[in-house]
């Protein structure tokens, strides 16, 4: 299979760390499929150095997430690659994309707390952003072949709030970074770094 991964958040915190760890570990265990990573141009060289795999193609795309360009230009780029499947590790999916895809939903925090307190946008702009988020996450969830939820409670929220059938949502817990697990081992064995 030819599988695409939206890795535009590769060097960001949170979802970016999830994405980079997912890619590194997936490429380590999967020797059968071919992968295409879509990364920001500014991250291209770093991703190429960090991930060495013969079955990997890296494409630089300067398309910001949550943008109009994402909805139109990114769809065209994805279509050109004729992918069998795309994984969007974040809710921001080009809703015009009509080939098979999987989406990871980490939480539905904006459904519960759409206050704007965590944003530096003016309230009217933030309200539009929340409406866009709700529209895109609902559309993407409906079109996705599968939805990855990072916990049972997130799965329950997806089923309840987005009205998605339970069997479409798969719970896959996020793993801990090796740096953390190695640190915990040293602490447990009372060793100093």
Predicted regions mapped to residue ranges:
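Carbohydrate transferase catalytic cores enriched for Leloir-type hexosyltransferases
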Residues: 1-193
């Amino acid at each position: 299979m030819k599988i695409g991964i939206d890795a535009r958040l590769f060097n960001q915190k949170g979802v970016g760390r999830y994405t980079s760890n997912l890619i590194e570990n997936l490429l380590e265990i999967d020797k059968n499929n071919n992968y295409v990573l879509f990364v920001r141009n500014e991250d291209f060289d770093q991703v190429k150095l960090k991930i060495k795999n013969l079955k990997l193609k890296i494409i630089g795309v300067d398309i910001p997430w949550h943008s109009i360009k994402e909805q139109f230009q990114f769809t065209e780029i994805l279509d050109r690659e004729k992918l069998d499947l795309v994984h969007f590790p974040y809710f921001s999916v080009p809703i015009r994309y009509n080939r098979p895809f999987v989406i990871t939903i980490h939480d539905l925090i904006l459904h519960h707390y759409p206050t704007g307190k965590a944003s530096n946008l003016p309230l009217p702009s933030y309200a539009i952003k929340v409406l866009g988020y709700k529209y895109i996450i609902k559309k993407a969830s409906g079109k996705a072949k599968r939805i990855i939820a990072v916990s049972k409670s997130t799965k329950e929220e997806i089923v309840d709030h987005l009205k998605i059938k339970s069997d479409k949502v798969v719970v896959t817990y996020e793993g801990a970074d090796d740096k953390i697990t190695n640190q915990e081992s040293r602490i447990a064995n009372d060793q100093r770094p």
